[in-house]
């Protein structure tokens, strides 16, 4: 089983990463792994566990952070800003034009996830999002041609 460091070395110089922190208490280890391998491509730390983003900020003060939302809280923009996020990740089926605009007004970049079929990719793009997260990046390339 490859480690995070193995994965970082494998993509170094070829791609940036969206590094999702799925387990509480992993922020420091993730940041240290990125630093140990001297990974110089862009890394966005993302999590549904928003306190993990606050922890990342402790160890990597300038790192881009993405607050991921499944079910939307009352005010996702405030929640993201409170945790120091620079990006917001919204489920493709919960994102709305109004919410994307509110995020942009707050200075947040917006991505939709996990848009795997062309219809969902096009929907996300039509909302004016800054990025689309997919298990099939070639479909995004096709949709944006």
List where the protein language model places each region.
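Metal-dependent phosphodiesterase/phospholipase catalytic core, i.e.
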Residues: 1-71, 83-92, 104-106
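C-terminal active-site rim and adjoining tail of enzyme catalytic domains
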Residues: 1, 66-145
């Amino acid at each position: 089983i490859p480690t995070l460091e193995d994965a970082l070395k494998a993509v170094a110089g070829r791609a940036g990463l969206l590094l999702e922190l799925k387990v509480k208490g992993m922020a420091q280890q993730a940041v240290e792994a990125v630093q140990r391998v001297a990974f110089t491509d862009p890394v966005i730390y993302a999590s549904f566990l928003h306190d993990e983003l606050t922890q990342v900020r402790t160890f990597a003060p300038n790192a881009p952070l993405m607050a991921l939302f499944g079910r939307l809280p009352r005010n996702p923009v405030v929640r993201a800003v409170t945790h120091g996020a620079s990006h917001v990740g919204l489920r493709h089926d919960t994102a709305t034009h109004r919410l994307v605009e509110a995020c942009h007004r707050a200075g947040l970049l917006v991505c939709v996830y996990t848009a795997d079929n062309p219809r969902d990719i096009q929907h996300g793009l039509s909302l004016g999002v800054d990025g689309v997260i997919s298990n099939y990046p070639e479909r995004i390339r096709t949709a944006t041609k």
